[in-house]
């Protein structure tokens, strides 16, 4: 193990992924996964040398508390002083940042200004940056923007049908998210298929508590489901996805809610949680649905139907489809969500092999469609942390 270690922090809306990555080998020295943050069930799991240790986050179930637990673990293994730089996933970089950047106060000001555009994620990202600056004073911090991959979308895909003056004044356009994940998954999928990425019309579904789908043609993003903010598109854990904008005026006029309350409801109390009235966690809902919980069943039906509709629509952006790729926590592990979604899409020639679908979970990648089937359906575990580490090393000059 070298001393060229990079700490990567990926603070999601309800999760924390942390990893210490050896820049020379690309190997993960230590990692952690904080799950179900902001709930009483919040836990953080540390992994090192094949050994795992789970610790409850009771009393520290926020992002800052999870980062603090990670930093304590680094000191325990004498890794703290060997960290050379810290890389952070940033959900929304706005129009100003189309690529990764060294973080200074001006960047922090811009990220704070983008909080209204990513109210669940940017505050979590900023918490990670502040914690790293506190525990690693003097070390460079790098922000890797989730929006940058989608800067290649054509104007017809990112333009909203609103007055031009508003679009220009407020940079009001579709940005897209999960770009760091797409940058990793797309070439990995191409490698599995044994074809150049530029020759594959690929649709990638990143499914987690936040979820989006991206159409990739000639190796570049040509359309995506998320828009100005991460609320647009698919049904997610607590976000509603696509909804009639008239809901805002209706609820403010008839339900006694102000705009901020409507915004909080659509971001934090909707999606799978809102439909099921049980949980935002897909694992919990799958178990409950099997046990006869009607709300859980409906939530999963709505989620998979919306996802299938978006997959079909993304084929327009690609001009067809050669490969459908599932990634993200749900996409990588839920055979039921994959099977149900693809069952709507046989008219596109998409099919799933039951045995392969069962096997490709828990870190296993590969093709889950029948061997004689085209287009291909794949599972590819994402590795946003490695992409962030590579960008961080490049910006700070760690060769």
Swiss-Prot record:
Pathway noted in the entry: Metabolic intermediate biosynthesis; acetyl-CoA biosynthesis; acetyl-CoA from acetate: step 1/2
A Pfam family that the UniProt record links to this protein: Acetate_kinase
Positions of Mg(2+) binding: 10, 384
Ligand binding (ATP): 17, 206-210, 281-283, 329-333
Keyword terms of this UniProt record: ATP-binding, Cytoplasm, Kinase, Magnesium, Metal-binding, Nucleotide-binding, Transferase
Protein name according to UniProt: Acetate kinase 2
Compartments where found: Cytoplasm
GO terms, molecular function: acetate kinase activity; ATP binding; magnesium ion binding
Keyword ATP-binding: yes
Residues at which substrate binds: 89
Entry keyword Flavoprotein: no
Active site as annotated: 146
Chain positions of site Transition state stabilizer: 178, 239
Family: Belongs to the acetokinase family.
GO CC aspect terms: cytosol
UniProt remark on cofactor binding: Mg(2+). Can also accept Mn(2+).
Quaternary context: Homodimer.
Cofactor(s) recorded in Swiss-Prot or TrEMBL: Mg(2+); Mn(2+)
Catalytic activity entry: acetate + ATP = acetyl phosphate + ADP
GO annotation terms (biological process): acetate metabolic process; acetyl-CoA biosynthetic process
Record function comment: Catalyzes the formation of acetyl phosphate from acetate and ATP. Can also catalyze the reverse reaction.
The EC number(s) this enzyme carries: 2.7.2.1
């Amino acid at each position: 193990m070298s001393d060229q270690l990079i700490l990567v922090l990926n603070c999601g809306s309800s999760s924390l992924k942390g990893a210490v990555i050896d820049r020379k080998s690309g190997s993960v020295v230590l990692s952690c996964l904080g799950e179900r943050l902001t709930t009483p069930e919040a836990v953080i799991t540390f992994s090192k040398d094949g050994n795992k240790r789970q610790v409850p986050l009771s009393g520290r179930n926020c992002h800052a508390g999870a980062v603090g637990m990670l930093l304590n673990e680094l000191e325990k293994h004498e890794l703290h002083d060997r960290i050379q730089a810290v890389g952070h996933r940033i959900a929304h970089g706005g129009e100003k940042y189309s690529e990764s950047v060294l973080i200074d106060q001006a960047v922090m000001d811009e990220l704070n200004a983008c909080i209204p555009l990513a109210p669940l994620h940017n505050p979590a990202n900023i918490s990670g940056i502040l914690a790293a600056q506190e525990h690693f004073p003097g070390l460079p911090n790098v922000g890797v923007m989730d929006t940058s991959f989608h800067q290649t979308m054509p104007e017809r895909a990112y333009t909203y049908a609103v007055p031009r003056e508003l679009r220009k004044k407020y940079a009001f356009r579709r940005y897209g998210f999960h770009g760091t994940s797409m940058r990793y998954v797309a070439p990995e999928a191409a490698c599995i298929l044994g074809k150049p990425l530029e020759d594959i019309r690929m649709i990638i579904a990143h499914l987690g508590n936040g979820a989006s789908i991206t159409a990739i043609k000639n190796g570049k993003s040509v359309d995506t489901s998320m828009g100005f903010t991460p609320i647009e598109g698919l049904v997610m854990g607590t976000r509603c996805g696509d909804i009639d904008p008239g809901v805002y005026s209706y609820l403010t006029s008839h339900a006694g809610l102000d705009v901020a309350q409507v915004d909080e409801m659509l971001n934090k109390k909707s999606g799978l949680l809102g439909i099921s009235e049980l949980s935002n966690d897909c694992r919990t809902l799958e178990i409950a649905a099997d046990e006869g919980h009607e709300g859980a069943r409906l939530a999963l039906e709505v989620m998979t139907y919306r996802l299938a509709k978006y997959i079909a629509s993304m084929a327009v952006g690609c001009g067809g489809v050669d490969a459908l790729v599932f990634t993200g926590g749900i996409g990588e592990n839920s055979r039921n969500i994959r099977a149900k979604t693809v069952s709507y899409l046989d008219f596109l020639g998409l099919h799933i092999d039951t045995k392969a679908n069962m096997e490709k979970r828990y870190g296993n990648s590969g093709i889950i469609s029948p061997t004689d089937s085209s287009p291909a359906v794949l599972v590819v575990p994402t590795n946003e942390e490695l992409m962030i580490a590579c960008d961080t090393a490049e910006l700070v000059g760690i060769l």
